[in-house]
From Swiss-Prot:
The keyword Hydrolase applies. It comes from Elusimicrobium minutum (strain Pei191). SUPFAM superfamilies: Metalloproteases ('zincins'), catalytic domain. NCBIfam families: rRNA maturation RNase YbeY. Gene3D superfamilies: Metalloproteases ('zincins'), catalytic domain. It is an enzyme of class 3 (hydrolase). One of its GO terms (molecular function) is metalloendopeptidase activity. This is Endoribonuclease YbeY. PROSITE patterns: UPF0054. It is found in: Cytoplasm. It comes from the Bacteria. Belongs to the endoribonuclease YbeY family. Binds 1 zinc ion. Single strand-specific metallo-endoribonuclease involved in late-stage 70S ribosome quality control and in maturation of the 3' terminus of the 16S rRNA.
Length: 143
């Protein structure tokens, strides 16, 4: 599994923990992480995430994380993670202050959450959201 990390906004160097983010995404992808596939983790600012959210999801506001699954381009690769995870650094800073935790942990939480979506988890119902939050927390404690 190839996991690429891109910083498309100014993220201070002490928060650019690429290996940590890759470990979180890999752990969230679980059994898929050892297979073929490629995931891009892209850190963006509030303006960019708002634009993506409006253009692709028809939501006119900024958000914390957005994931997109793409069809796997190789024969026999259907169902393998292949996609983009957009994490908003600005929202991570705001929410870290609001929730009283570190910015890095907030960024990692969003990266793991996005990867869980690529692995097939959903958070459309309260029960699903709770399961996803539990799994996110378990993964963060593990890495």
């Amino acid at each position: 599994m190839i996991i690429n990390v891109f910083y498309k906004t100014k993220v201070p160097s002490h928060f650019r923990k690429t290996s940590l983010f890759k470990a979180g995404v890999s752990a969230a992808l679980g059994k898929f992480a050892s297979k073929k596939g490629e995931v891009n983790l892209i850190f963006v600012d509030g303006k960019e995430i708002h634009k993506i959210n409006k253009e692709f999801l028809n939501h006119d506001y900024k958000t914390d994380v957005i994931s997109f699954n793409y069809p796997f381009p190789q024969k026999g690769g259907e169902g393998l993670p292949f996609g983009d995870i957009f994490v908003c650094y600005d929202v991570a800073k705001e929410n870290a202050s609001l929730y009283g935790q570190g910015v890095l942990k907030e960024m990692l939480t969003y990266a793991v959450h996005g990867a869980l979506h690529l692995a097939g988890m959903d958070d459309a119902t309260p029960k699903e959201r709770s399961a996803m939050d539990d799994e996110t927390g378990r993964i963060i404690l593990k890495i």
